[in-house]
Structure formats: structure tokens, C-alpha cells
Amino acid sequence: MRQRNKPWADEYLQENNHIVISDPKSKKGNWSQLFNNNNPIHVEIGSGKGQFILGMAKQYPEINFIGIELAKSIIVSAVQKIEEENLANVFMLNENAIDVREMFADDEISMIYLNFSDPWPKNRHEKRRLTYGRFLEQYQDILGANGEVILKTDNRGLFEYSVVSFSQNGMNINEINVDLHAIQDETNVMTEYEEKFSTKGQPIYRCKAAFEK
């Protein structure tokens, strides 16, 4: 779905630089100082309008969260929600996550969430998928011991591709779920897309995978 342009987005994000970190590369290795604690740090790549990361931050105040979203017209919605809730354990990055190692140091992150990522279904676009090998190499570097990558998607093709990619890149598969809502996981926090697709009866797929460290 094409997002409407919001001319005020740039100014709004600058005004809320206490939520949107403008130079994340300078914080590499020092995110705990920014949060002012040593709690685990979880990262969501592709946060959209922020429903998931806001819900997680409220549900788990003992965990720090960082959401990455490239589209200014979308991330402003997440920032507005965080500002309204006055949450201290979540920051947003208006960045392209093409190489997360530029923003995070080795072993600095405890969890990575990939929620309803673009499936890039054409073979020639395989390298753009966030579960492609070169991305997994980056995740391996920044994840600490026992750190997981958690994928949720409505796209079976991306799900199957990702499970294979995880395995081929040395990850242990901790969970494979082909109908997440059938198990009624009370800890599951839904994204906007997840609510939309699940109300239509579409199965939601989830996979949890981890590197051995």
C-alpha cells in the first residue's frame, strides 16, 4: 500500500530527537548508556507504525527496544504513540537497515524481530530478503549468546525460504509454527498487518532461530 506523503514528517522527527535517534552509528557499542541501564536490547527491523514495538515496550518494561523504520511517513505514527505513552525503554531509528553492524556492536543485541518483512518473491530479488545469508551474517555478529531471530509473516514462500536459510547459515531452529493464532499464545503481540490478516482467517507463520555462541 502506498503511503501518503507527510510534508511535516522531517520537522516532527527532528523535534522528537529524544525518541528518534538521528545518528545511531555514533551510539554503536553504547546503547546501554543511552537507555541508562544494562537491560537486554531487542531490535525490530521494519517497525511500521509501531504497534508491535509499543506493545512489547509496555509489556516488558525490563527490556529495551529499538525500532528501525526507513519510511518517514510511517515512522511518525510510531513516534507519536511512544510520545503519548511516555515510554523510556524504546527508541526509533529512521534508517535503512542494510547493514546493522554499522549501528550495533558485536554481541550488543539480545533479540531481533522481523515482522511481516517484504517477501521480495522474485528470484532476482533474493538478496533483498531480510533472511538472506548476508543479513544473517550481520545478525550473528550483533546478537549475544542465546540471542534469537524471530520471524513472523503471512507469506508462506518467505517463511519456507527463511527456515531453509536459517538452517543453511548455521542457525538452530527453536520453533516452527505454521498457524500461530491457533495455539493462542498470550505473550504474542500483534502488528498492524497481523491483525488485518488474521481477521481474514489467514494463517500467521512464526519461526524462532538462534546461532550457537
From Swiss-Prot:
Gene3D superfamilies the record matches: Vaccinia Virus protein VP39
Domain of life: Bacteria
Keyword Nucleotide-binding: no
Signal peptide: none
Keywords from the named record: Methyltransferase, S-adenosyl-L-methionine, Transferase, tRNA processing
Reaction catalysis annotation: guanosine(46) in tRNA + S-adenosyl-L-methionine = N(7)-methylguanosine(46) in tRNA + S-adenosyl-L-homocysteine
E.C. numbers: 2.1.1.33
Binding-site positions, substrate: K122, D154, T191, E192, Y193, E194
InterPro entries given in the database record: SAM-dependent_MTases_sf, tRNA_(Gua-N-7)_MeTrfase_Trmb, tRNA_methyltr_TrmB_bact
GO molecular function: tRNA (guanine(46)-N7)-methyltransferase activity
CDD domains in alphabetical order: AdoMet_MTases (cd02440)
PROSITE patterns per record: SAM_MT_TRMB
Active site (record annotation): D118
Residues reported to bind S-adenosyl-L-methionine: E44, E69, N96, D118
Known pathway: tRNA modification; N(7)-methylguanine-tRNA biosynthesis
Gene Ontology CC annotation, any one: tRNA methyltransferase complex
Stated family: Belongs to the class I-like SAM-binding methyltransferase superfamily. TrmB family.
Annotated function: Catalyzes the formation of N(7)-methylguanine at position 46 (m7G46) in tRNA.
Name by which UniProt lists this protein: tRNA (guanine-N(7)-)-methyltransferase
Species per Swiss-Prot/TrEMBL record: Oceanobacillus iheyensis (strain DSM 14371 / CIP 107618 / JCM 11309 / KCTC 3954 / HTE831)
Lineage summary: Bacteria, Bacillati, Bacillota, Bacilli, Bacillales
The gene coding this protein: trmB
